[in-house]
C-alpha cells in the first residue's frame, strides 16, 4: 500500500474536518483597524461606527457569497448591521454566528467586543471556498451596548426579528462576546455565585460556552464539536436564564424569537477588569489564545452536522437534570464539563 492510498483511507475513516488555523497576523491587523480609530465607535459617534461597519463589509465581501448592510432608524439616525452568507444554495436551516462592533463610551473596546468581531472576520476568511453542510450567516451587530441593551433597538434584535418575520428557518445562533482576554494569575476569575469557584477554578485561563436550560440540538452539537477541537481549555455551563451573566450578549434576542442560541465568552467583567474602561486595549489581549478560540468555533461550524464527535453530547446529562430534584450545589457540579 503506497502513502497516497493510506492517506485517502485515513481521510475516509476520519469523522471530522481537519481544523483550519486562524492567522495571528490577520487578527492583529483587524484589531488595529477596529480599535485604533480617530474617535470611538459608540452610538453617538456615527462617523466612526460607519467607518468600522465599512471595514467589516469590505472584509466580508472578499470571501462571502453575499454581503449587505441591514439598516434601521433610531431617533432619526441610521445604524447598520453587517451581514454575509456562505452556502446560500443549500436548502437547510441556517447557522448564525455574530458579534457586536459598538462600544460603551469613550474607549477602544478591544476585548468588548473587537475580539468577537475579529472572530467573525477570521471565520469569513476560513469559510471561503469550504464545502458546508448548511448555510452560515455571519453578522456584525450595532447597538448592543447601553443605552440600547435589552431594547428592540439592539442590532441583534433587528436581525433576529427579521429572520422571524421572513420565516427563515434557523438551526441555531452563537454569539462571540469577549474572547481575547485570558489570565494565568490565581484569583483572576470571578463568578456571579461563589460556589462556581469550586467547580471552574479561580484562574481565568479558559473559554466558556454558555447555554440556558432547555436548549436544543444546536447548542449540544456545537459544544461537542468545540470541545472536540481541543485547541483551548474549555468549560461549559447550562443554567437557568435567571442566572446573572447567562444572557449578557446578542444571543438573548434569538432566545426571544424562539431560536436555539448560545454564547462563547471569557466571562467578561468576571475576569477582565478593563471592561468598559479605557484600559480595554488590544495590547492587553492574548492573541494566541484568541486564535485558538476562533479555530474551535470554525471547527464546530464546519462539523456541526456530523454526529460522531467521539465524545458524549455535553447537553445529555444536563437535560436529565431538568426533570430531577437536586440541590443547587449538585446542579453546579452537573453543569461542569
Give the location of each predicted region.
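A non-catalytic alpha/beta surface segment that caps or lines the substrate-entry region
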Residues: 29-87, 237
